[in-house]
């Protein structure tokens, strides 16, 4: 994958650089899980993950909920991400459940946790149908498990760090791509739920601040614009050096279709990125502190998504 070098390198405007540095500092503060996985100043409210010395209860199990895919790489990616989560939080019981297409299915995972506490962390990027309806339905069908549902992964600055890292891997050079010809299309699955679209737009805005160039959300289904349409619109504005950021947690049909629009400038899905593992634990920590008798699951997800 070779990119042509511009005649004169462009740098991001000073304001964009300053904002990007501020966003990076904010990212580190918002994460309750430091990079080395040891407790830090932001971990004051986090309970130990092993049973307390006085025989106290263990931490709730973390159940990561993936969508599921016919692409075998999707399952391998989810398992690799959960390995990173375990590395960051030794002693925490981390399990996987799928909404469809792959085993273990979520009901089977919950069935193995009867009588226990669990926090469901959706490996999903916005407040769509699965988060609002499928997850609450699954917990209602498992009354023997004391469950809390975490917010979806997006939007959050840690997602932006993962997106940025994947773009750099695909050839994005911050020193060269800050000029008037550069832009990014944030390729997402798409949903008819307006909250999901809003979450994608918020992530696009955060990524634009991080990169210092326009970032346009586009969709593989159920919403507009499509990725090819977004690329054409950017080209009409003189933005010809356009990369596609893959706003998918794992490989799959939609991710591949979006990447095919610009195969030489398409980033990989978020996958098993260190920032993703930190974000999974951040969502887990926020949800485990919420009361079991709090708001209805869908309302609680909406509240937590802003954190």
Predicted regions and their residues:
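Active-site-proximal alpha-helix that buttresses catalytic centers in soluble enzyme cores
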Residues: 1-307
């Amino acid at each position: 994958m070779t990119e042509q070098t511009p005649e004169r390198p462009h740098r991001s405007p000073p304001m964009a650089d300053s904002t990007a540095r501020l966003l990076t500092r904010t990212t580190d503060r918002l994460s309750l899980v430091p990079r080395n996985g040891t407790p830090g100043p932001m971990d004051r409210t986090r309970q130990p993950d092993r049973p307390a010395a006085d025989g106290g209860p263990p931490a709730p199990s973390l159940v990561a909920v993936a969508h599921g895919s016919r692409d075998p790489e999707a399952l391998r990616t989810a398992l690799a991400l959960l390995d990173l989560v375990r590395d960051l939080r030794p002693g925490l019981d981390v399990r996987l459940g799928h909404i469809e297409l792959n085993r273990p299915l979520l009901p089977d995972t919950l069935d193995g946790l009867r009588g226990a506490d669990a926090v469901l962390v959706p490996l999903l990027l916005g407040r769509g149908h699965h988060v609002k309806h499928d997850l609450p339905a699954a917990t209602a069908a498992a009354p023997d498990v004391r469950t809390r549902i975490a917010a979806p992964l997006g939007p959050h600055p840690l997602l932006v760090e993962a997106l940025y890292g994947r773009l750099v891997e695909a050839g994005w050079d911050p020193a060269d791509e800050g000029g008037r010809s550069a832009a990014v299309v944030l390729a997402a699955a798409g949903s008819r739920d307006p909250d999901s679209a809003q979450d994608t737009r918020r992530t696009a805005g955060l990524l634009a601040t991080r990169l210092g160039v326009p970032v346009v959300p586009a969709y593989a289904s159920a919403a507009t614009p499509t990725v090819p349409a977004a690329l054409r619109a950017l080209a009409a504005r003189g933005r010809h050096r356009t990369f596609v950021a893959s706003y998918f947690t794992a490989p799959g049909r939609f991710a591949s279709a979006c990447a095919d629009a610009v195969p030489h400038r398409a980033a990989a899905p978020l996958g098993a990125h260190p920032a993703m593992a930190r974000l999974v634990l951040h969502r887990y920590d926020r949800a485990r502190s919420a009361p079991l008798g709090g708001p209805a699951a869908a309302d609680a997800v909406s509240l937590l998504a802003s954190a």
